From Swiss-Prot:
TM annotation in the entry: 25-45, 86-106, 111-131, 142-162, 181-201, 202-222
Compartments where located: Cell inner membrane
GO terms, biological process: proton motive force-driven plasma membrane ATP synthesis
Annotated organism of origin: Geobacter metallireducens (strain ATCC 53774 / DSM 7210 / GS-15)
Any GO MF annotation of the entry: proton-transporting ATP synthase activity, rotational mechanism
GO cellular component, one term: plasma membrane
Function: Key component of the proton channel; it plays a direct role in the translocation of protons across the membrane.
HAMAP family: ATP_synth_a_bact (MF_01393)
Protein name (database record): ATP synthase subunit a
Membrane-protein topology: Multi-pass membrane protein
Length: 229
């Protein structure tokens, strides 16, 4: 849902030659804004590293350390190489969700193109990791444990794997877009009484959706690392 007042209106004009819709242009604009924001925060946090962290370094160490602990608890030590990917996706989704709570800003995750792009990254990473780890034996993940059921299981597994990016993208898009719609309705009905509780609910929804997306990404990659039986 597009806010009545947008912060980066000029992007619509900039992207007009590409015939991109207004909602798509807004999503692109705010996606780049979030990328720049995360880069600036990372540069500030790592500019002058200290043995005893303070300020932004301390905050980012807590955030990144929390994500790292979750990766280790879910995937074990073999999940460490995939921590940068999972942490980047988690932070991007979280900030994308939260930015919609600022008046005049649009959450890119309320646009299906953005959520689909993130889901495709997870989908491709899962199978690239699986092929890199197991080689051609990775195909055994799709065959099932009983050889004479392999053709049927292969078909079922293919459908299951193709449904993963669909469910990942639609879940995040549906929740964030639905929240935007509900927020707009309540703002129209009671602009002075409802905003605060709705904003608090928005923060909760933003964190939950980022957590669910990160958790599913870890589970999918973890599954591709396991030996097929």
């Amino acid at each position: 849902m597009v806010h009545p007042l947008l912060f980066l209106q000029f992007f619509r004009k900039l992207l007009e030659p590409l015939h991109i819709s207004e909602a798509g242009a807004d999503a692109i604009a705010y996606t780049w804004l979030i990328i720049v924001f995360l880069l600036i925060v990372s540069l500030i946090a790592t500019k002058a590293l200290k043995a005893v962290p303070t300020g932004m370094q301390n905050f980012m160490e807590v955030v990144v350390g929390g994500i790292e602990n979750m990766v280790e608890e879910t995937m074990g030590e073999k999940g460490r190489p995939y921590f940068p990917l999972i942490a980047t996706l988690a932070l991007f989704v979280l900030v994308s969700n939260l930015i919609g709570l600022i008046p005049g800003f649009f959450p890119p995750t309320a646009n299906l193109n953005t959520t689909a792009a993130c889901a495709i990254i997870v989908f491709l990473s899962t199978h690239v990791v699986g092929i890199k780890k197991h080689g051609f034996h990775y195909l055994q993940h799709f065959m099932g444990p009983i050889w004479w059921l392999a053709p049927l299981m292969f078909f079922i597994e293919i459908i299951g794997h193709l449904s993963r990016p669909l469910s990942l993208s639609l879940r995040l898009f549906g929740n964030m877009n639905g929240h935007e719609l509900v927020l707009m309705i309540f703002f129209a009905l009671a602009p002075f009484l409802v905003p605060l509780p709705m904003m608090l609910m928005g923060v909760l929804v933003s964190f939950i959706q980022a957590f669910v997306f990160m958790l599913l990404a870890m589970i999918y990659i973890q599954g591709s690392l396991e030996e097929a039986h």
